[in-house]
């Protein structure tokens, strides 16, 4: 029997940069996001933190394509994607994993992957080979015929990550990936996300309130409050920054 063939993998140097240029969003007279700039580079993991009301979620949803910016641009390499809908962004290389469960509950783990792969212009045998390769990569081969509703929170999250890779994205946008996941599964998901960066060269952009679990992964951190980016730097610099402690982390925070 022939081993499943993995999808072609691009090195980080072959992938475009994802950049936000002066993003702004207002609702009536209330400015929620004001002139936000950030960059996610291929092969790095970047976190966006912020207290409630900081504009973090609005910024993240502008990147995903749920909310249209009032000002500014979003580019993927030299391509302006600001006004493109979510499915067009996905086609260009922006993958998205929502906070809410997104696996099809009444499909098996394998069929969850095939349901997405069927939309790609691939022979059926290659679709099945890619599905099996992803199941193996994410430690789900033994659950390939289990229905999604039968999986634990950690298993389901791994399936959703695998499904996000069926489109061979350049970037994955992860919304609260550690919510509802037990500590052991969190460590496994952290390992898998690192492998996406290290082995596939994928850029990962995370927003999550689980600061310690997220910061353990990240290469760089952005912090928002009052609708603006107030900090950008390494996790170590973030943990030591006075403004970050005052507005978000608290004085007793330790890495």
Predicted segments, located by residue:
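Conserved ABC ATPase "signature" region
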Residues: 79, 114, 125-143, 191-194
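Catalytic Walker B motif of ABC-type/P-loop ATPase nucleotide-binding domains
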Residues: 172-176
